[in-house]
Amino acid sequence: MKLSPTLGQHPSHLVKAIMILLISFGSVGVVGGSFFLKKAVSSSNQPEIITDTSRYKEIRHQLWFSQDEIKHFPTEISVGVENVRLAYSPGVSQTGSYFQIRLKKSPQQIQQLLTQYRKQARHKYRGGDTNVHANLPNGVPTTFFYTGETTESFPPSYEILVLNAEDKGRPGFKWNHGDSYGVAIDSSASEIIYWAEKW
């Protein structure tokens, strides 16, 4: 007795072609899907940095979580203020957040602000950045020059006045977490930078 060939015993060329096509599309789908998934995950790990000065009021009054840390910031940017620069990052996951606004003022206003903030400052530095300041004897973390054009470190013409710095790290991990805020003033350029950091 002879058995007649069926699809189960001898698949036709058409079935083989369909199987190859399905496996190929499945592979492309897996590779493509993993690419887009990786892009979505990696882009969500990058902190958003906002530099649009028109969003200052929103950041100042709604987005920054601790109003005590920015109570020294202006409530709004006056019309006609020149050379305003802003840098805000809400931070994600393990990165810290920061907020800086850089303003040009009249020399008289700068002198008044310098006198006012020198009296309030708990720590004072000349130029540098947070890494330099934190590693000085009795130093505290400050900020980087986020609103600068070329460097992350303040030039020596800037006086960095720390109004408060709070260590929230665990024993043995000094300054692992914390916050600091203050101003950086360049009298020669008639500029003031209001800053706050949280990590």
Give, region by region, the residue ranges found by the protein language model.
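Generic structural hydrophobic/aromatic packing signal, biased to beta-strands
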Residues: 1, 81, 101-103, 183, ...
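N-terminal Sec-pathway targeting helices
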Residues: 2-30, 34
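Mature extracytoplasmic domains of secretory-pathway proteins
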Residues: 75-80, 85-161
